[in-house]
């Protein structure tokens, strides 16, 4: 009797065909009716994934109101039900012939399992020849909300054919979109289907026609077309990308990425991915022959991958290359991270980690991607870099060491020829390209930096005390070109060694209190940090990768004010800071936190990076005896929806603020949000205003279906916007449409660009158009509500392979 259930998987062919192209990101089904298109059937087993996995080993039970016929031709009548595990098949009548293998089920034929439901008028076939036919079908995917119908389904073994079938995720009474196909061939053994003359309808209007296409019906990948992406911008014109997926092997595949830009021409791209037991990788390449705007060939190559050597060691690489310094500007449209977009980093290395140690051997190289700069702005290449760290408790002590050896090289910088008189850079870009006439040679050198330390962390219920003593030794081996560069003294093997001593101590007080009828736990957390580092003259040391840290609250508790090992500031200073928090006792949420601190300098700090060999290192003010700027941070949760935050630095020497930022956020219903921020920074070198910006962004739900989105990012210094976004979103049970208009600064010269982005999301099927989610998630903090509580990887700029003890407070 178990073979009688052979017909049960047939409707799954319909169920899996079209939704196999569904989007990976979570979908919002909140606007869908609570009632399923096909409610669960009476008498059907409850959904049970475990039973679904075991169904082939379970027996089949059959029941009905009446049983007639003979032992070879039984007939079941009235409420016929077949059950096996999570499967249920019901019908009004079931006739069988055990000698010929024929069967007929008719009258209210219905089927249900954990993921699928179906009703049909009639099902008939032959178990021996494994041929089946089901007529007048309606079905529903329980988890995906997909539903539709088919006039009939024919099955011969593992090959089936559906006639006049449809698919949608909409309410059947109001199908905003649906896919119709007069004929779909399904091969369950090979795992693919072939649709002919399929049409995507929005309402009753056909919008896409597919004369023939193949698609997967299970998790096995299949070669075929992916949904296109298109957009419109002032730089590229009409932009159309048609991905073509190639399933080359179970462990590697490729995607062809032909792209047409009306103002530039055809770009040919490809993406290749591979996967094996010990690692994976991905390489992407693009080539644009004879760009119509630039009159030259353009291209790029990107690779990333890793290989697990063993449980402790992993090899990783990330390679980036572009054909010219305008490539990033012309083919990307990000406004955030413009500084990082001025260069591309390529790295390759092997990295290890253990219970008490980390180590690595790597090399990197930088490429300039901003035509407004020259190679002097590039960081030094590290070719190679080796590092080792070790840290372990030893009784009441904790000992550790950080060691690094690096060979630094730099691409020679070239001068830029002046423009032709009366012309612009865009008109004569060739006159601006870098030539082979060298203006300056940076030279190269090697550096060894070793920093052993020992500390004694002591703590109690309301206090902690951690004295630490370290010794830092740094040695260089410079080539003559670099050693003879001013202001270096010609010494090719300079060294520096010095002790570092610190004492970190703090107290913790708390009390129970109430405010406006709410009970709180109020804390007071004073902290003291003393640092002593003797002065060493470091003017003969080059500057390779060292910059001053941006002064912040965390900087109050570090033993150096530099990132990198080329400078170690002298210090005789004491940090005094305090933090106070108000924590709600009923749920532990922080209502208010206030932090403030200041460094007291008992003597001048004479070490600076001024007058170094590296012009890109910038300059800094000498730290004089006295007091640092006051640093204050505050966060206030007005209620569960409204929060405010502020950071403020006030300099008692200049009696001016060095930095100020204010931000507020209001959470609306239906995942709406409003953000408002102000940022100010003063240039400490010449006391001029360095940055003054206002930023307003929102996702405002007008009603459950409509919402407005926007951003206005404005520079008060330049008196011009940096980015303007305006758009609307329409959402329904099964369809979402987003339209954006965007104006943004596209380069350091302040030139503006415009773009229009439109995206259609057919829920449970796919999306086409430009990826507006990426733009809105970057521009509107909280567009994805989870981003308020998690740090998105795209927003972190620290390279995990660049361990630096100076970054650890």
From Swiss-Prot:
It comes from the Bacteria. The keyword Membrane applies. GO terms for cellular component: cell outer membrane; transporter complex. Residues 1-22 form the signal peptide. It is found in: Cell outer membrane. GO terms for biological process: Gram-negative-bacterium-type cell outer membrane assembly; lipopolysaccharide transport. Component of the lipopolysaccharide transport and assembly complex. Interacts with LptE and LptA. Belongs to the LptD family. This is LPS-assembly protein LptD. The gene is lptD.
